[in-house]
Amino acid sequence: MSLEVRVTELESRLAFQEDTIQALNDELVEQHKRIERLQLQLSALARRQEELQGQVGIVEDEAPPPHY
């Protein structure tokens, strides 16, 4: 295999690697954005659950009805 063919092959491989790295980086950025959105949603759900538990706690503190 001549030196020119080897260099051409290496350049071709390098180009494919660069494309693959860019595609992986793009996907990583998208996943990071999704994770941030999910963390915000999870925080909102946790706050909402705490609010609801606080409301339920008030009801649970009441005495049971007379038929118990």
Swiss-Prot record:
This is Protein SlyX homolog. InterPro entries: SlyX (IPR007236). Belongs to the SlyX family.
